[in-house]
């Protein structure tokens, strides 16, 4: 028993919140331990607030942590004795992961290889089926009495015995979501379908082009593939931007050796995946197809955009390109930037639960709150590594994050004061006083690779003229956009002004300074992507500046973004700009 307060950093509270003292001697190691099973909620200057949630504990359980590990971490770093209910709550919550196990039905071992068939062509009795195993008599009765589950689950008629439920294979995803809503995550150990063979090998190059797998990349692939044992082959890998998530995806493709669908954020990312595959694997160019608005070519390795999959003529029509997902015998689906997976795509993924699914992301946070859908339909977190750990080992650049709070002039303050709430957001974002700050920062970092990133086109046009820099927006033709990116990589262009198109999957390894002049209402996703643009390993440190209008809603939004960076381990300074 801890008879008196000590210098440990955690204060664990009975409501499952944890206060973390940033000034305590073991703050950093406590933060890393806590990040494996809790979520950061608030990050003021002295005390950070984390929360332990059922989903955070289930992700921890899926990654191999047990309740004893969680409680031991809390006890080790806690300043006071744990509230007496905490060990019980942790144990009870984590025990729910695995209480329900999805397995192949004995009579459907062969049929389970046929997951892509349209269930509408069969009767309910003939459709491939799975067994939901439940060894808890009370939970079994709870499921039996739940009329809402009756449309998908029926008492099993197999020899497996009492306590099991039968379900159609096509309902696999839906049942996982419905039971998670009721507080019971399913451990899915049912068979995964084998796709058509597509063997590829990594090509490590020679001389200046030589490269090798980093230890954490190899660990990530092993954690996903899992020796192809039951319960492996699906899930999410969480790695920082700039740490080589694309290489992890390609290594997973090589390990599985089957036809692969890669879904990513935009056409530029499609092209980048193609270039990486051709540079780092032995795949023949003709084996790679693009499925976008401009080109629709399905090959053994097909790269598509989220936009094309969610396109439909009108809101009452079906999504015509979903048929491509259902029809092809994919052995692996890779969802790049999985935190951006559009809600309509979840519907298709729910029907493809027999296909291996790999999610790649820098953050599990979704702005729409659908983290539970990712957990159910893509899979639990299989591997993650803190940004700061990779930074210390030199795998990504050391970054300095600074929020600069800038006053508004009298005219802008008056306009802001009388504006409606929505208008306040844009007025604060387009504060003209930010221009001198951006110009000063650009001059200070002259000669370095600088990205000025913003939300509003009119504002970006003004900054491009002020800085004498090229502007890239969604309206920039693809060939012009690619030419400017190439010039930046070659060092011929040292400063780019870019809109949100630069947030996702663009490889600009020489960028070392990012100046954010406006953003997406405090999006933590966006902060991860923007910081990631400057985190590629390089000789000099990287700098991330966020320009915020003082005494405005932008300060509130900045708090949301700041929380994400602190969660990842970055020291975050706040400075007030006075001319």
Name every feature range the model reports, one short phrase each.
Residues 416-455, 461-462:
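Conserved interdomain hinge at the start of the Helicase C-terminal
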Residues 332, 339-400, 565:
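Post-DEXD/H (motif II) to motif III coupling segment of the RecA-like Helicase ATP-binding lobe
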Residues 1-114, 118-199:
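Extended alpha-helical interface modules used as scaffolds for assembling large macromolecular complexes
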Residues 497, 506-519, 543-546:
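A short beta-strand element within the Helicase C-terminal
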Residues 271, 287-290, 451, 458-462, ...:
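Conserved helicase ATPase core of P-loop NTP-dependent helicases/translocases
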Residues 230-252:
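Walker A/P-loop
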Residues 364, 521-544:
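Conserved SF2 helicase motif VI
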Residues 268-294:
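Conserved helix-turn-beta segment of the N-terminal RecA-like "Helicase ATP-binding" lobe
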């Amino acid at each position: 028993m801890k008879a008196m307060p000590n210098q440990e950093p955690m204060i664990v509270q009975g409501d499952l919140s944890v206060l973390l003292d940033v000034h305590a001697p073991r703050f950093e190691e406590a933060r890393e331990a806590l990040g494996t099973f809790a979520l950061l909620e608030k990050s003021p200057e002295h005390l950070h607030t984390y929360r332990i949630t059922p989903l955070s504990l289930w992700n921890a359980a899926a990654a191999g942590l047990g309740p004893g590990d969680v409680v031991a971490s809390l006890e080790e770093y806690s300043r006071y004795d744990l509230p007496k209910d905490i060990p019980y709550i942790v144990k009870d919550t984590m025990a729910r992961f695995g209480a329900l196990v999805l397995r192949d039905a004995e009579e459907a071992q062969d049929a389970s290889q046929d997951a892509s068939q349209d269930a509408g062509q069969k009767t309910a009795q003939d459709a491939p089926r799975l067994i939901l195993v439940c060894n808890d008599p009370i939970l079994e009765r709870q499921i039996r009495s739940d009329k809402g589950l009756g449309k998908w689950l029926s008492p099993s008629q197999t020899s497996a015995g009492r306590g099991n439920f039968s379900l159609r294979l096509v309902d696999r995803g839906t049942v996982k979501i419905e039971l998670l809503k009721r507080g019971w995550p399913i451990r899915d150990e049912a068979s995964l379908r084998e796709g058509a063979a597509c063997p590829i090998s990594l090509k490590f190059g020679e001389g200046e082009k030589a490269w090798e797998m980093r230890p954490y990349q190899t660990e990530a692939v092993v954690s996903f593939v899992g020796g192809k044992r039951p319960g492996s082959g699906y899930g999410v890998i969480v790695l920082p931007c700039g740490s080589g998530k694309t290489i992890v995806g390609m290594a997973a493709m090589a390990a599985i050796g089957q036809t692969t669908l890669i879904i990513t954020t935009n056409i530029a990312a499609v092209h980048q995946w193609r270039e990486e595959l051709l540079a780092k694997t032995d795949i023949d160019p003709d084996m790679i197809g693009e499925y976008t608005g401009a080109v629709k070519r399905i090959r053994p390795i097909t790269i598509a955009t989220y936009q094309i999959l969610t396109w439909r003529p009108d809101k009452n029509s079906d999504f015509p390109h979903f048929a491509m997902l259902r029809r092809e015998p994919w052995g692996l689906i890779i969802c790049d930037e999985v935190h951006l997976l559009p809600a309509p795509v979840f519907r298709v993924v729910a029907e493809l639960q027999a296909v291996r699914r790999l999610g790649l992301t820098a953050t599990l946070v979704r702005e729409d709150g659908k983290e539970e859908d990712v957990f159910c339909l893509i899979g639990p977190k299989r591997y993650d590594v803190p940004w700061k750990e990779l930074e210390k080992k030199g795998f990504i650049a050391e970054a300095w994050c600074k929020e600069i709070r800038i006053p508004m002039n009298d005219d802008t303050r008056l306009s802001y004061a009388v504006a409606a709430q929505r208008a306040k957001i844009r007025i604060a974002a387009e504060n003209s006083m930010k221009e001198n700050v951006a110009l000063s920062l650009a001059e200070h970092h002259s000669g370095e690779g600088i990205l000025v990133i913003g939300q509003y086109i009119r504002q970006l046009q003004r900054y491009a003229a002020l800085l004498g820099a090229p502007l890239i927006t969604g309206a920039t033709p693809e060939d012009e956009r690619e030419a400017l990116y190439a010039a930046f990589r070659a060092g011929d262009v040292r400063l780019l002004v870019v809109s949100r198109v630069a947030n996702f999957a663009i490889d600009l390894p020489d960028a070392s300074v990012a100046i954010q002049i406006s953003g997406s209402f405090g999006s933590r996703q966006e902060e991860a992507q923007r910081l990631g643009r400057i985190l590629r390993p390089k000789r000099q440190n990287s700098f991330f500046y966020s320009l915020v209008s003082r005494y405005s809603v932008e300060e509130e939004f900045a708090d949301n973004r700041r929380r994400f960076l602190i969660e990842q381990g970055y020291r975050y300074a706040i400075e007030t700009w006075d001319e």
